[in-house]
Amino acid sequence: MAFQDLLDQVGSLGRFQILQTAFFCICILIAYPHMLLENFTAAVPGHRCWVHILDNDTVSANGTEILSQETLLRISIPLDSNLRPEKCRRFIHPQWQFLDLNGTFPNMSEPDTEPCVDGWVYDRSSFSSTIVTEWDLVCESQSLISVAQSLFMVAQLLGGLIFGHISDRFGRKIIFRCCLLLFAISGTCAAIAPTFPVYCSLRFLGGICLMNIITNAVSTMSEWTGPKSIALMTGIILNSCNIGQILMGGLGFVIQDWRTLQLTMSIPLFILFLFSRSVLESAQWLIITNQLDEALKELRRAAHINGKKDTGETLTIEFVKSTMKQELDEGQTNVSLFDLLRPPKLRVRIFYLSFVRFAATIPFLGLMLNLQHFGSNIFLFQIIFGAVTFIVRCAVLLTMNHVGRRISQMVSSFLVGIPILVNIFLSQEMQTLRVALATLGIGATTAIFTTHTVHHNELVPTVLRSIAIGLNAMFSRLGATLAPLLMILTVYSPDLPWIIYGVSSILAGLVVLLLPETRNQPLPNTIQDVENNRRDSRKTKQEDISMKVTQF
């Protein structure tokens, strides 16, 4: 592409790209853990009903102090099917007859019970405070936790659609900075939320911003990097998500109060917002939208940072116009979602890309929900999960550049689907093997998302890239919403949801083969670049540009 020649002059992989990528990584390292924050801030600790004779100090000191806590619990709380104290009911009156261990009561009716009308007592050994303990989100109210999490997912879906279009209209930098500031404000205010509805509203606002911070960072660096280095830069940025997961596990273990943890993960975002002024806007986007003066400034700044000051000073608006004349002519009109779906070849690409993202997200969420039942130490599990996905992302960077985007996604998809299907035939006693296969699946989904992000950006033209990313994120959120709902099918067969998870991933691996390979190919700038698929014409165009540069 013509822009690649401009980028080669200012440096396609130099000090500027490294510094800006490092800044984006720090932002995402702090922002992404908010997606996992409710693993800790909304953790449900062990709990039981508040009991008058057990938890009222005045009553306990009036004769019942000679009885042990276990005995008082036995006469106050009924047992569930697992012979453990009920979490949501208590006896209306103490069952003193239970103190006679040898007594039998063949004619005694079942003791009357009642809900926890006086509240609950929580196990605070792991968490001193969560939103669950603060607002009593247990028993009949426990479903409200899922409501909060679902709202966060829906917010990400809406955010991708809304800000994806705005980003293509007004630029990557301004949307990145606005979302970073709003995310910092919503996260900080959520830490001091007085009620659960206010907390949910603030989390919803944060969800709208979160994915746009990540997608605009990836888009910006994809447009500032040469074709051979796009996969590397994208992988590094996405790897900061995994480092954030490890950070989240450590902080969750150290900080056991949910408000303090929420503040700790939100306050640094204000500092990052101040530094975000130094971020360079995508020169490629500026040129496509005919903002040549601004594009020239950004190109010169990049050249100066990369140590090519002399080259940067030789760049002129006339040279930029002559180099990217066709892209400027085709990029004059405003674009919308309909422009993304109107051209036939681009429409097919978007359909395949959306299906792959949708089908890959379903098993990812299915595995995440299932893995939570395997680990009793969620702090350690969070760290291990982050470490595994970090290693996988590093490994997939090598495979992408050696075997290509399509084969990498296909193999990763099979490594998700096959272990899920194999797990169906393993007994519950084979827990170690089941966890190992599930962890393999989680790692493979990480590989899919990393490769898919790179592949997606290389298949969509610059003028529509943010809109396409927003649409792609919408299908990802649809998959995330559908995944837990599929567990309802267990009433028909306990294996049915897992069959769907496994098959959907394998289908994604097959569909990705219908997309063109993009390894070492320049990014398309316009819709015509996609529709004409002009590889031969690109070579001719590059030769013409080389002649212009020589003459210049």
UniProtKB/Swiss-Prot annotation:
Naturally occurring in which organism (per UniProt): Equus caballus
Comp. bias intervals (Basic and acidic residues): 531-546
Keywords from the UniProt entry: Cell membrane, Ion transport, Lipid metabolism, Lipid transport, Membrane, Steroid metabolism, Transmembrane, Transmembrane helix, Transport
Record's keyword annotation contains Ribonucleoprotein: no
UniProt-listed Pfam families: Sugar_tr
Family indicated by similarity: Belongs to the major facilitator (TC 2.A.1) superfamily. Organic cation transporter (TC 2.A.1.19) family.
Protein name: Steroid transmembrane transporter SLC22A24
GO molecular function: transmembrane transporter activity
Gene: SLC22A24
Catalytic activity: estrone 3-sulfate(out) + glutarate(in) = estrone 3-sulfate(in) + glutarate(out); 17beta-estradiol 17-O-(beta-D-glucuronate)(out) + glutarate(in) = 17beta-estradiol 17-O-(beta-D-glucuronate)(in) + glutarate(out); taurocholate(out) + glutarate(in) = taurocholate(in) + glutarate(out); glycocholate(out) + glutarate(in) = glycocholate(in) + glutarate(out)
